[in-house]
């Protein structure tokens, strides 16, 4: 009788160990799947970082380009501020140079310099939390 109870105890212990082994295998499979998902998240995070770096570069370029918009104001277009700058440069150049005949290219350049510059194109970029 003691022998049968010992066999029954060992069977219960064996069943318990089989159950623990099955749970361990499930846990191992879930951890492997989690590892794959974490690796994918890491890859996606690197991709997002690259995209954000590209957008940062684009925004910096737009910012630098918009600085050139500040060169002339609307009032400058009305008064022709660029023409007075060009005339001042031409007068200094005429004093420095000897009296030589002007070529047709110089005349064309001078005429183009007297025309008002075209305004820059305005670009609107949605940056963050921009409410429409």
Swiss-Prot record:
Residues 81-132 are annotated as: Disordered. GO terms for biological process: attachment of spindle microtubules to kinetochore; cell division; mitotic sister chromatid biorientation; protein transport along microtubule to mitotic spindle pole body. The keyword Nucleus applies. The keyword Cell cycle applies. It is found in: Nucleus; Cytoplasm, Cytoskeleton, Spindle; Chromosome, Centromere, Kinetochore. Pfam families: DASH_Dad2. Keywords: Cell cycle, Cell division, Centromere, Chromosome, Chromosome partition, Coiled coil, Cytoplasm, Cytoskeleton, Kinetochore, Microtubule, Mitosis, Nucleus. Residues 94-105 have a biased composition (Acidic residues). InterPro entries: DASH_Dad2. It comes from the Eukaryota. Its main location: nucleus. GO terms for cellular component: cytoplasm; DASH complex; microtubule; mitotic spindle midzone; mitotic spindle pole body. Residues 21-50 form a coiled coil. Belongs to the DASH complex DAD2 family. Component of the DASH complex consisting of ASK1, DAD1, DAD2, DAD3, DAD4, DAM1, DUO1, HSK3, SPC19 and SPC34, with a stoichiometry of one copy of each subunit per complex. Multiple DASH complexes oligomerize to form a ring that encircles spindle microtubules and organizes the rod-like NDC80 complexes of the outer kinetochore. DASH complex oligomerization strengthens microtubule attachments. On cytoplasmic microtubules, DASH complexes appear to form patches instead of rings. Component of the DASH complex that connects microtubules with kinetochores and couples microtubule depolymerisation to chromosome movement; it is involved in retrieving kinetochores to the spindle poles before their re-orientation on the spindle in early mitosis and allows microtubule depolymerization to pull chromosomes apart and resist detachment during anaphase. This is DASH complex subunit DAD2. It comes from Kluyveromyces lactis (strain ATCC 8585 / CBS 2359 / DSM 70799 / NBRC 1267 / NRRL Y-1140 / WM37) (Yeast). The lineage of its organism: Eukaryota, Fungi, Dikarya, Ascomycota, Saccharomycotina. The gene is DAD2.
